[in-house]
Amino acid sequence: MRTAVTRYPLSPLWLCAALLVSGCGGGGSDNTPAPPSNGSGGTPAPEPEVDFSEADTAFQNFLNSNAVFDGISYVVVDAGGTLHTATFGDHSEDTVVMLASTSKVPAVMTLMALAEDADASFDINQPIGEVLPFDGVYADRTPAQLVSNTSGIPGLRQLAVYGPHLCQYSFDDAISFEACGEVLLSVPLPDSHDAGSIFDYGGSQWQLAGVTASVAANATWNQLVDQYLGAPCGLEVFTFGNMWEDLTQWDGTAGSLKGRGNPNIEGGAITNLADYAKLLQVHLTGGYCGETQVLSEAAIAEMRVDRGGVVAEEPVPYGMGWWISRDNPGVYDDPGAFGSVSFMDEERGFAGYVAIDDYTRIDADAPVRLVRTEIIPLLQAAFDAAAD
């Protein structure tokens, strides 16, 4: 195991929020103020460190006992920065992985940022037919319905009958992002439902949300990701492509990523640990990357509102990008088909991301089960112990 523990200070904006009365704008004095008293004439004790050793051991034990995975790694953050990074097996901190559905939270972040841009004409509650230059049977659905899996458009359960909708999983240069979107909007799928009536995870609805955003902004999807997340957060690797047509062509480097011209919105992103850590921090800092606010607190909160659990058919607690835990209140996660998963504990103020780079899907549920049943409870106990 290779492990590194780093604690970064709060950004100046967050120090301002924490020190409202004192102020952060300077005061014309060159004197360094004395640290605040702890009530007994001394200075405050240093903030206790969280002990990640039990979580590290659980990851190592998992790797030792599972014949499928050669490596696993994870990072934990809070509002102040990266708290802990650990790598196991053949992983390093620079390992780049395909995220599959762990792309969903960053995809929604991009949509929400576009919706909050005063210079853009995009509304997550506006029917997509009012934006797209073509009409179709699903024109009355909204982006909010699309990325909460409540649009009524059949999800991945109907993949076998997707037919022309499979264009969304191709890296063929002849298939354009917008042209595929027109197919998705205009070709009805079997077992379609009214918007807002059923929870049906994944698939064409997510691609339509991305196409609508691109058309509204007159930009490619990756241009939007770079504008609203990549540049302000200083992301080095994170981007979207589309490897689903042939996963074997991925060699673990960003240069091998195909399908950037027809990116898969729900499951096409790649990342390293550091980039995803920065994205998770946005959810803990009130929407900030460093000193730049990329999302409002309201947008962050809206992503966690249960939309999937309030429909009439097949209800499942789900926000926009986040699965909402039934058994662990205040916990949200975004697992992917290969085993990677991101998660957040709203009450305790931490979030994490676990990277997997085995794409056989032989035992892809195992890392997600590990995180949900062992790792998150261990981290919660560690944070609680540090707070006592």
Segments predicted by a language model, with ranges:
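Alpha-helical scaffold elements that line and support the substrate/ligand-binding pocket
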Residues: 80, 98-121, 146, 186-187, ...
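Active-site-proximal loop and beta-strand segments within enzyme catalytic domains
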Residues: 68-70, 91-201
